[in-house]
UniProtKB/Swiss-Prot annotation:
Record pathway: Alkaloid biosynthesis; nicotine biosynthesis
Location in or out of the cell: Vacuole
Modified residues (Pros-8alpha-FAD histidine): H118
Pfam families: BBE, FAD_binding_4
UniProt source species: Nicotiana tabacum
Full protein name: Berberine bridge enzyme-like D-2
Lineage per the UniProt record: Eukaryota, Viridiplantae, Streptophyta, Embryophyta, Tracheophyta
Length: 566
């Protein structure tokens, strides 16, 4: 009897060990020692020394995990259960960046490219297809070189928005740049998806103000605008990040700003009826305001215990001018908002970027050196979705939306106004297409903490809630297709069921990939999708740079390629 029990325990232990081994192998895609030695030797031969290999039992992993975790902004993808890269490479020059790509190719590794790590779905540092992958992290490629004579700047792909803003402000107090409000976002990915911000109604997106770029392609070539060709240059501006090659640097156009701008954040909490009426008026006003004015809304639910008590509506305003001018414009166009002089603060443009940032303790907007901080303190677990609105939503429709919002205290919804320059620029000017006819963009967001993430039912509940919110809004937003913003990536829209690896040339498979990607591609890029497929086929016919929601090439036209290293 004892012997039978002992044998049963032994079998159980063996089974548990096998399960543990299988689970671990799923997290770190299997890679042969030969492949690992190949890429390590290749990197060393190319004098790339700043890299870290996934830790084994005989290799301490502190440096690896410090590198990996530093720029993971969505903690959903930092969990031990998520796949991990075999190697993390941190190139420190364009030569090392080129070498990193060639070594990954030689070792048959998938490549993930990370700039600031703000990918909403973790696609810059996670791969879910089971293949060994490498993260090329651009954090050391963060130089910003400003040339006031030409009113341009070369910005390396690993620089953050905050570093870029700070460098511009050190060179001039009458120049700025049109991009997002979160200073730790990397410019490489942000501009690749378009890049919307407080100056976008005046000057368009970040990508609208790119005049040249340096792109490392899958063959290790460093291509400028002329060398890559106009179609590829068009595609990399708004066509999404991580799928064309690696942006070594953007050449951006500096934009004129006055020495004094006005900023305000005014809370307007109240009942659903009160907030609905304010929001209804906002959507009629904000897209039609002067080009110099930006006015957005952020809403969440306040509750006492589990009982909703009111909706918190927060209006963020930015004006390229004095507060007297700003208040005069608002009093005429939107008196219901009730903004008064004491709500407004006059400051420089660079101070406004800190004022609207998500950095902690920014009451002192004169300490703009904080914009250079690369580490984002307010990391969280989150899920987001997006929409575009073409016709005003009725008060009843807004009330319905707030009915869903009040169910989840961790939920948020943000309305960003379009119009002005966003209305005038052609939807074909760059790959980002959401222009004329769009009143505003919606971002749905739900954020939670680690204790809730450890509770599967709770974390799944947050995801279910945001999907419910999204479904509820369907009658009120764009349709055929229901448009989305690629920088707010949402894998719910669909994923590639396979990445159609390097050795396929079957037209049927190519057609399948292109049509499969159309499901999300037309939501992000509307009528620009097919043009993006052609650009992808030109610059990356082997689909080396890919992720779950990439743009596939037309494989039937693939050329033969051979690659070698030292």
């Amino acid at each position: 009897m004892k012997r039978n029990i002992s044998m049963s325990l032994q079998r159980l232990l063996i089974i548990l060990m096998m399960i543990s081994f299988l689970f671990t192998s799923l997290l770190v895609p299997s890679v042969s020692a030969t492949n690992l030695n190949t890429i390590s030797t290749c990197l060393i031969n190319y004098k790339v020394s700043n890299f870290s290999v996934y830790p084994t039992r005989n290799h301490a992993g502190n440096r690896y995990y410090n590198l990996l975790d530093f720029s993971i902004q969505n903690l959903r993808f930092a969990a031990s259960s998520k796949p991990k890269p075999t190697v993390i490479i941190v190139p420190e020059s364009k030569e090392q960046l080129v070498s990193s790509v060639l070594c990954c190719r030689q070792g048959s590794y998938e490549i993930r490219v990370r700039c600031g790590g703000h990918s909403y779905e973790g696609t810059s540092y996670v791969s879910f297809d089971g293949s060994p992958f490498v993260v090329i992290d651009l954090m050391k490629l963060d130089d910003v070189s400003v040339d006031l004579d030409s009113e341009t700047a070369w910005v390396q792909g690993g620089a953050t928005l905050g570093q870029t803003y700070y460098a511009i402000s050190r060179a001039s107090d009458v120049h700025g740049f049109s991009a997002g409000s979160c200073p730790t976002v990397g410019v490489g990915g942000h501009i690749s998806g378009g890049g919307f911000g407080f100056l976008s109604r005046k000057y368009g997106l970040a990508a609208d103000n790119v005049v040249d770029a340096l792109l490392v392609d899958a063959e290790g070539r460093l291509l400028d605008r002329k060398a890559m060709g106009e179609e590829v240059f068009w595609a990399i501006r708004g066509g999404g990040g991580g799928i064309w090659g690696i942006i070594y640097a953007w050449k951006i156009r500096l934009l004129k700003v006055p020495k004094t701008v006005t900023s305000f954040i005014v809370p307007r909490p109240g009942s659903k009826r009160y907030v609905s009426q304010l929001v209804h008026k906002w959507q009629l006003v904000a897209p039609k305001l002067d080009d110099d004015f930006y006015l957005s809304i952020s809403m969440s639910s306040a509750s006492k215990g589990n009982i909703p008590i009111e909706i918190n509506a927060q209006f963020s305003g930015f004006y390229l001018g004095t507060k007297t001018e700003a208040i005069s414009i608002l009093n005429e166009a939107f008196p219901e908002l009730g903004v008064v002089e004491s709500d407004c603060k006059e400051m420089s443009w660079i101070e406004s970027t800190l004022f609207f940032s998500e950095l902690d303790n920014v009451a002192n907007t004169s300490d703009v050196s904080r914009l250079k901080e690369r580490y984002f303190e307010n990391k969280s677990y989150f899920k987001a979705k997006s929409d575009h609105v073409k016709t005003p939503i009725s008060v009843g429709g807004i009330m319905t939306a707030l009915d869903v919002l009040e169910k989840e205290p961790n939920g948020h919804v943000i309305f960003d106004p379009y119009g002005a320059a966003m209305q005038r620029i052609s939807e074909e000017a760059i790959a980002f297409p959401h222009r004329k006819g769009n009143l505003f963009r919606i971002q749905y967001l739900v954020v939670w903490k680690e204790k809730d993430n450890n509770n599967i039912a709770k974390s799944n509940g947050y995801i279910e809630w945001i999907r419910e919110f999204y479904n509820t809004m369907a009658p009120h937003v764009s349709s055929s297709p229901r448009a989305a913003y690629v920088n707010y990536m949402d894998l719910d829209l669909g994923v590639m069921d396979d990445y159609l690896m390097l050795n396929t040339s079957i037209t049927a498979s190519a057609d399948h990939a292109v049509e499969r990607a159309r499901v999300w591609g037309e939501k992000y890029f509307l009528n620009n999708y097919d043009r993006l497929v052609k650009a992808k086929t030109k610059i990356d016919p082997l689909n080396v740079f890919r992720h779950q929601q990439g743009i596939p090439p037309m494989f039937a036209s693939m050329p033969e390629h051979t690659y070698s290293s030292k």
